[in-house]
Every structure is written in structure tokens, then in C-alpha cells.
């Protein structure tokens, strides 16, 4: 698993086990493939997403979305309580369906977790199976360590944490909504999100 803010800061997932999560995300250009959808479905079959946790899943392409429909994977996701979205590669980018808020802790299959990349909260990176397992448990874990009963966390504590984070956001210096620079037109299909909007600019502008 990669710890928040630094995708290269990887540790054994056991070191982060039991970290409470508020949301989980499976998708992006790196982990929204058919094999990723199947891995998540295998974990979620006959299980439910933990109370207080939101699991969002975004397949990479329409072809994968339709294959999920054909294989009954979407039904598995829906029965588990998943928010299953239209296809796209930008689900893990701030402003998209995978975005998190101030004080929120997310475990994600995105390719980056720089500050601001997926919203204003903290983002851990993990495999699709581990993300699905964590969504069921309510905390970071692996598919072979899912509890029979999800963790029960204090809603008041969670609400207070969000409130404190939101108040801190209000005291931060306002960031510009617009930036100026040169525009490059690249007529290629294999463009990644860093080429579209580089991660070093994610904290320069306000994603909202």
C-alpha cells in the first residue's frame, strides 16, 4: 500500500491495517481493467460495503462496462452497495466521481496520491482486491482478512473530524481558479493525466 501524499512511500499493507476509511475507489487508467473488475467482484460477492463507507467503481472503457454487465458483475456490485459509474479514465482526478473531501480517508486504486490529486482528503493506494476488502471491513485490510462483521465506528467522531477539517480549509489562503501558460496540442491517443494536467499544479489551483 502507498501512504497518503507520496505514491513511492510504499509499505506492507499490514502496517496500515485497521486504519479507518470513509471511502474507497476502484478504477482509473491503471486499475479499471476487466481483470480488476473481476477481482473486485470476487471479493464483494455475497458481501456488503460497511456502513458509513462509500465504494465507487469506475471501469476504464465502455467495452469493459458492457462486459461487466454481460458477466453479471454490475449486479454483484449493486447487491454489495457499490456506486457504479459510467466508464472513464479520470475517476481518480479531483472533480470527478472519486474525489474525496476535507478530513476524508480514502483507499484507492488510482495511479497517484499527491495532495489534491483525488480531492482534499487523504488517499492510500492499493490493489483492487485490497480496496474492495477494505470497503467491506470499514478499515484497511486484505481480501484474506475480512471480518465477519464490519468495524463499528463512532459517527459523532467522524462528523467532528470532518467539521475540523472543513474549518481548517476555510482558513487556508485562497487559490486561483485560473492559471496562465502555453497550450500544447498533442495529437496522440496514449496521453496520461499528468500530461493533461500535471500533478505539480494540483495544489496551485482550487479544485472546487
Positions of PLM-derived features:
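Fe-S-dependent hydro-lyases/dehydratases of central metabolism
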Residues: 1-208
